[in-house]
Amino acid sequence: MRLCRYSTPIAYNLSPLTYQVTISHNSNSMGIGYSNVQCYLTRHSNYMKGLVIKSIGTSYGVYFEDGTTADCHVKGNFRIRGIRSTNPVAIGDYVEVITNEDGTNWITELYDRKNYIIRRVTNLSYASHILAANVDMAALIVTINHPKTSTTFIDRFLATCEAYRVPACLIFNKIDLLNEEELQELASLRQLYESLDYPTYAISALRLQESELTKLFQNRITLLSGNSGVGKSTLLNAILGKDIARTGAISSAHHKGMHTTTFSEMYPIEGSGVQEERGSGGSGSWIIDTPGIKGFGLLDVEKEEIGHYFRDIFHFSHDCRYSNCLHTGEPGCAVYQAVAEGEIALSRYESYLSILDDTQERKYR
């Protein structure tokens, strides 16, 4: 039997495990509801339920309700059990672990996810990699320059979050390095995405102080993502109050960042209550650090559905003449007309077309 984590308070008396689940619904500064799950586990025999907080190759670091962690592995037949991804187990997954007599730990079951977010596998465009599961919020770190984050990358990230039901926000970093023209570009981008109800923040991670951004990470599991070199590691260190992640330089030749994070890991935020809650199984505040990302994509999505994951395009699509309109110049296309009249940003429409091209070529199928 699987553990239900999304209904009203419920208790299970199971053998060999006993679970008690308490669900509390909260709101946050973004206006997004989320569930803060507290699970109490009674250890029995050599089975235990845990939370995956680290992933290195085929090895997973699992955090248990009693505050201990262990290195765990996945059995081969588990990896191909209907999971279309290079990694069937991801950061943020709740798993069941069995310890053998020789002391090795094996993940034997993956509990249902409330959501997850994927990226494209480099040089293997038809495959996906799950960045994290059970995420309360995904934050994309964006830079106007040093290096430049493209609007296509931003829109692919947001569309992916929409498709997999992950609330998202944008954090514009390195604003202290911007000139007047770049500051105007920053203001325009913030206005664009805030008009679509995506929260945006403008910061300098090197000068990060107590602010609404700090509160953004409280009482939730947050995924930090972005291109290499956008200052993700610097921001992570500032939030955690210590040097956890290595920071890197920008390539002078290509103006791109060099990878400093090589694997995904989840960190507790000190002072958020997570330390006190660990013993009782509370979720507290966590940040998931991921390696620099080069591309996002949609998996198992029909081309007619892509517009559903662009809030502006979806809004105007209701007025299209044909229900299966792809918004590429069909007669009576309200989206195409909205782009021509400036009601949909051209950059957003071009991002939509790029994903549509990928889907038609079955790159993510």
Question: Each predicted region: which residue ranges?
Answer:
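Helix-rich effector regions associated with P-loop NTPase G domains
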Residues: 47, 58, 84-101, 112-131, ...
